[in-house]
Design a protein with these regions (language model features):
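Active-site-proximal specificity loops/subdomain of glycosyltransferases
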Residues: 65-113
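GT-A fold catalytic core of metal-dependent nucleotide-sugar glycosyltransferases
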Residues: 107-134
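N-terminal anchoring/stem segment of glycosyltransferases
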Residues: 1-85
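Generic signature of intrinsically disordered, low-complexity segments enriched in small/polar residues
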Residues: 9-11, 45, 106-109, 117
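Small-side-chain structural scaffolding
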Residues: 39-42, 58, 100, 111-112, ...
């Protein structure tokens, strides 16, 4: 994957074509630990806006905290800014519990509660930006 990032990444010496600072928000859980470091790396490599902060919203997890520390990101506990928990949501589609998906949507939409920039980009923890994006 590093080779792919190098091949498609922007020239690190080039100036950013945008002066609009943004924050990046990535909701994650422990099952995302295999991809999370790459999501962070590819975002830094391929987002053409100056990035102020990268926030990882997650449950209280030492493993995710370690990734955040190693990658210079800020971990936000998912229960620290919404007035309800995932367990408060009763949402089923075709008999399948979709409360986790619904909760994730609320987390994404509420990121303005902690982001320092007016504008922010939300990336899912399984989304690698393989080419430059504004």
């Amino acid at each position: 994957m590093r080779k792919l990032g190098f091949c498609f990444g922007k020239d690190q010496s080039a100036e950013s074509p945008s002066s609009l600072k943004i924050d990046i928000v990535i909701p994650a859980i422990e099952k995302d630990l295999d991809t999370l470091p790459y999501v962070i790396d590819f975002a830094r490599l391929n987002v053409l806006h100056p990035i102020s902060n990268i926030y990882v919203i997650s449950p209280d997890s030492e493993k995710i905290k370690q990734v955040c520390t190693a990658k210079g990101c800020i971990q936000i506990h998912e229960e620290s800014f919404l007035p309800f928990r995932k367990s408060d949501i009763d949402y089923r589609v075709g008999g399948v519990d979709r409360a986790g998906w619904m909760y994730q949507q609320f987390l994404k939409l509420s990121a303005n509660c902690f982001c320092t920039e007016e504008n922010y980009l939300v990336l899912d923890s399984d989304t690698l930006l393989a080419a430059c994006r504004t």
